[in-house]
UniProtKB/Swiss-Prot annotation:
Gene3D superfamilies: 3.30.160.810, Translation factors (2.40.30.10). The modification N5-methylglutamine is found at Q151. InterPro entries: Ribosomal_uL3 (IPR000597), Ribosomal_uL3_bac/org-type (IPR019927), Ribosomal_uL3_CS (IPR019926), Transl_B-barrel_sf (IPR009000). SUPFAM superfamilies: Translation proteins (SSF50447). GO terms for biological process: translation. It holds the Pfam family Ribosomal_L3. PROSITE patterns: RIBOSOMAL_L3 (PS00474). GO terms for cellular component: cytosolic large ribosomal subunit. This is Large ribosomal subunit protein uL3. Methylated by PrmB. NCBIfam families: L3_bact. It comes from the Bacteria. It comes from Rhizobium meliloti (strain 1021). The gene is rplC. Part of the 50S ribosomal subunit. Forms a cluster with proteins L14 and L19.
Length: 228
């Protein structure tokens, strides 16, 4: 099991394939995605790598985190994410991952925080049909209807779909195709839409349902850490 990467959502555009068909893609950018720490079976009980991405000003970084980054000889990061990996896929601390970590045609799972929509009714939030236009319905055409049963169970069931805050939740979209990558500019082009707003942090992993393709680099596509 390989590590994923932390990317930033740039936006959407389109590209054309060899047949002249346009493909809607989301552009994801890797910015200083480096290994900050390890988790090992002996010390932590599991194996993982901690990646950091982006840049954070030193004055805005807590002292404890400054020491954490200094131990890895990397600049303070804006985002930290931990990825479970197998022991043979551990990556050296300080190594920088590139867009070549993924290959064109492979499937990936993309995780992000959806755009918040605020308080929404049941029709918008859950695609309810609403009540009838006439026949006794008055001023409640867009309500969700009954909230439950009678004296038994005498309460509203957990998970009942009702009006409430819509969006701003952690969502994973599975099996998106990698259309192409640009290693020099650190870009990954993924077919279709990706959860999150422009500029938000996105986590990209090998698709759990299809696994790692044969042509993918192991343990990762890395740019050697700069010597100090």
């Amino acid at each position: 099991m390989r590590s994923g990467v932390i990317a930033q959502k740039v936006g959407m555009t389109r590209v054309y394939n060899d047949a002249g068909e346009h493909i809607p893609v989301t552009v994801l950018r890797l910015e200083n995605c480096q290994v900050v720490s390890h988790r090992t079976e002996e010390k932590n009980g599991y194996t993982a790598v901690q990646l950091g991405a982006g840049r954070s000003k030193v004055k805005n970084t807590p002292k404890a985190m400054r020491g954490h980054f200094a131990a890895a000889s990397v600049e303070p990061k804006a985002k930290l994410v931990e990825f479970r990996v197998s022991a043979d896929n551990l990556i050296d601390i300080g190594a920088e991952l590139t867009a070549g970590h993924f290959v064109a045609g492979q499937l990936v799972d993309v995780t992000g925080t959806t755009i918040g929509k605020g308080f929404a009714g049941a029709i918008k939030r859950h695609n309810f049909g609403g009540l009838r236009a006439t026949h006794g319905v008055s001023v409640s055409h867009r309500s969700h209807g009954s909230t439950g049963s009678n004296q038994d169970p005498g309460r509203v069931w957990k998970g009942k779909r009702m009006a409430g805050h819509m969006g701003q939740t952690r969502v994973t979209t599975q099996n998106l195709e990698v259309v192409s990558t640009d290693e020099d500019r650190g870009l990954i082009l993924v077919k279709g839409a990706v959860p999150g707003s422009k500029g938000s942090w996105i986590v990209v992993r090998d698709a759990i349902k299809s696994g790692t393709p044969e042509g993918a680099p192991r343990p990762a596509a890395v740019r050697a850490a700069e010597s100090k």
